[in-house]
Amino acid sequence: MDSNTVSSFQVDCFLWHVRKRFADQELGDAPFLDRLRRDQKSLKGRGSTLGLDIETATRAGKQIVEQILEEESDEALKMTIASVPASRYLTDMTLDEMSRDWFMLMPKQKVTGSLCIRMDQAIMDKNIILKANFSVIFERLETLILLRAFTEEGAVVGEISPLPSLPGHTNEDVKNAIGVLIGGLKWNDNTVRISETLQRFAWRSSHENGRPSFPPKQKRKMERTIEPEV
C-alpha cells in the first residue's frame, strides 16, 4: 500500500476529529455540518477499503499534524492561506427540503461514477424542478452535496447524492448524472426544469434562451425535457 495513501487517510481522520469537536460545541453552521456528515461516511468507506482502523489512524494523523505545526512559521501560514482559493457553499434547498423523507412507488436506482441516482418512475404529468446544494470554486460547481427533484407540491421524486465509499467527483460527473435523472423522469409526460443557480454554476455558458449548454450527445437526449427556471 502506498505510504502517501495511508498518511493522507491518517491526516484526514485527525482533521475530521478536530472538526467534530468544533461541531460538538455547537459552533458549526449548516454547510459545515453537511460536510462533516458526508466526510464521516467517506472516511468509513476509505477505512474499510484500506483495511485501516479509524481510531488508530486518527492518533497517527495527530502526530503528523503536530509535527507540521511545530515547523510552521506564522508568515508561511499566511502565505499558504493567501494562495488557496476559497470555495463558496450555495443552497437551492432549505434544511427541511434536504432532510424531507420520501419513498418511491416505482423505484429506479443507477450509479454513475461516484454518484448515486434514485428516482420514482411512477410520477406522471408533473412539473418537476431540480434543486441542489453544492460548493463552488472559480465560479464552477466543485462538490455536489445533494440534488433533489421536486414536484410543484413539494414532493421529492428523485435524488442525486455522492457515494460515501467513492469520494470525489467532477463537474462533468454531476452534469452526466443530471442527464440520467432527467432522462428517467421525462417519461409519463413530466416536464423537468433545472434551478437557475444550478444552471449558472454547472453550465457556465448558456444558449440565448437560457438553457444550459450540454455536450452534443447529452443535448440530443435532453433538448426536449429541460426548460429554464423562470
UniProtKB/Swiss-Prot annotation:
Subcellular location(s) of the protein: Host nucleus; Host cytoplasm
Chain ranges for the short sequence motif Nuclear export signal as given in the UniProt record: 137-146
Stretches the record annotates as PABPN1-binding: 223-230
MF (Gene Ontology): protein serine/threonine kinase inhibitor activity; RNA binding
Top-level taxon: Viruses
Gene Ontology biological process: symbiont-mediated suppression of host cytoplasmic pattern recognition receptor signaling pathway via inhibition of RIG-I activity; symbiont-mediated suppression of host gene expression; symbiont-mediated suppression of host mRNA processing; symbiont-mediated suppression of host PKR/eIFalpha signaling; symbiont-mediated suppression of host type I interferon-mediated signaling pathway
UniProt entry tagged with the keyword GTP-binding: no
InterPro entries reported in the protein's UniProt record: NS1 (IPR004208), NS1A (IPR000256), NS1A_effect_dom-like_sf (IPR038064), uS15_NS1_RNA-bd_sf (IPR009068)
Region named CPSF4-binding: 180-215
Main subcellular localisation: host cell
Segments carrying motif Nuclear localization signal: 34-38
Keyword tags: Eukaryotic host gene expression shutoff by virus, Host cytoplasm, Host gene expression shutoff by virus, Host mRNA suppression by virus, Host nucleus, Host-virus interaction, Inhibition of host innate immune response by virus, Inhibition of host interferon signaling pathway by virus, Inhibition of host PKR by virus, Inhibition of host pre-mRNA processing by virus, Inhibition of host RIG-I by virus, Inhibition of host RLR pathway by virus, Interferon antiviral system evasion, RNA-binding, Ubl conjugation, Viral immunoevasion
Pfam families: Flu_NS1
Region (Disordered): 205-230
Chain spans, region RNA-binding and homodimerization: 1-73
A cellular-component GO term for this protein: host cell nucleus
Posttranslational modification: Upon interferon induction, ISGylated via host HERC5; this results in the impairment of NS1 interaction with RNA targets due to its inability to form homodimers and to interact with host EIF2AK2/PKR.
SUPFAM superfamilies on file: Ns1 effector domain-like (SSF143021), S15/NS1 RNA-binding domain (SSF47060)
Role this protein plays: Inhibits post-transcriptional processing of cellular pre-mRNA, by binding and inhibiting two cellular proteins that are required for the 3'-end processing of cellular pre-mRNAs: the 30 kDa cleavage and polyadenylation specificity factor/CPSF4 and the poly(A)-binding protein 2/PABPN1. In turn, unprocessed 3' end pre-mRNAs accumulate in the host nucleus and are no longer exported to the cytoplasm. Cellular protein synthesis is thereby shut off very early after virus infection.
Subunit structure: Homodimer. Interacts with host TRIM25 (via coiled coil); this interaction specifically inhibits TRIM25 multimerization and TRIM25-mediated RIGI CARD ubiquitination. Interacts with human EIF2AK2/PKR, CPSF4, IVNS1ABP and PABPN1.
Sequence similarity: Belongs to the influenza A viruses NS1 family.
Recorded domain comment: The dsRNA-binding region is required for suppression of RNA silencing.
Protein name: Non-structural protein 1
Organism this protein belongs to: Influenza A virus (strain A/Equine/Alaska/1/1991 H3N8)
